[in-house]
Amino acid sequence: DLIEPLSLDEAYLDVSQQTLKLGSGSLMAKDIKQRIKRATALTASAGISYNKLLAKIASDRDKPDGLCYISAKEGPEFVKSLRVREFFGVGPATEEKMHALGIYTGADLLNWTLPELQPVFGKAAEFYFNAARGIDTRVVEAERVRKSVSTEDTFVRD
């Protein structure tokens, strides 16, 4: 199975092969959360779904110390209720553009065709178009090129 680190405290895990041996993704996530708690005394949130977009939204949905599962059957309907700001890659500027077009939720975004979105959002249009349908084709990548290396020290005085 694959682990794609995103930051010090966040990662995507593809456990689709392990679930055949060890049970559901939810059971595995519960076990991982318990191990983190025992080892560090810290809580962790987990989002389980059939793609990275919905797994991230699920994780953010139930913080702190939550566990949220979105099935493939629930995904497309779930996405309709999301505010566009909850979609990956939608920051304040993109949200403002979408609002100017009358797009406030995933359901609103479903009313737009890809050719209509492309002039406004460029390359990102295809991602938004698919996201509104619960589709995310990005795969978990175990090996990624490191973007930066840093260390941090805290001193008694500045």
Regions flagged by a language model, labelled:
Residues 57, 78, 120:
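Residues that scaffold the ATP/ADP-binding catalytic core of kinase and kinase-like folds
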Residues 1-64, 126, 130-146, 152-155:
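Structure-specific DNA junction-binding interface
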Residues 67-81:
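A short, charged helix-loop
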